[in-house]
């Protein structure tokens, strides 16, 4: 029987870098990013600050978020993160660490913005219709992710990846301007002031989208 060769050291190093596996607090974008950084994580924080459309009501949004959580990598508990509940998330992680008697790995994933390929706005902006769908940068999700990283650091969970540290720096450096930046963002312009105000007024409670489950 032919012996299965171990992957070259260079490949192993590249995989470790892409997965941020040596860090306790990790950060990436979209479901693809979640697939990369969720290995070994105990909590996955899905950051999604603003609704997808101005007509999406609270019930539809919860249903969509829970459906999405079911598609995320098996294993970690999945909680929703936004600009108001970073402290609740940090509290959950510290409780889980106490229960485990060991550190918890936290994967923070920003949803980003998604545009329907080939729609009128995309065409007018010069975007090709055949570009694969991937999350665009969303300032509101970056700042909320940074708020979670900052809240974790406040309770001593601060072994962060460079990606997570950069998100944290964005939040702490722009803390006084967060509401203005979100209200003036690309996503906010598509939703309208009332929808954005409601999102920014979201309560501080922990929202669990999926309990932890065994990895396949």
What residues fall within each predicted segment?
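Acidic/Gly/His-enriched mid-domain segments of enzyme catalytic cores or analogous surface patches
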Residues: 42, 51-116, 120-124, 128-134
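Long, charged alpha-helical interface segments
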Residues: 68-80, 91, 101-102, 120, ...
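An almost-null, non-specific background feature
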Residues: 34-38, 50-59, 98, 115-117, ...
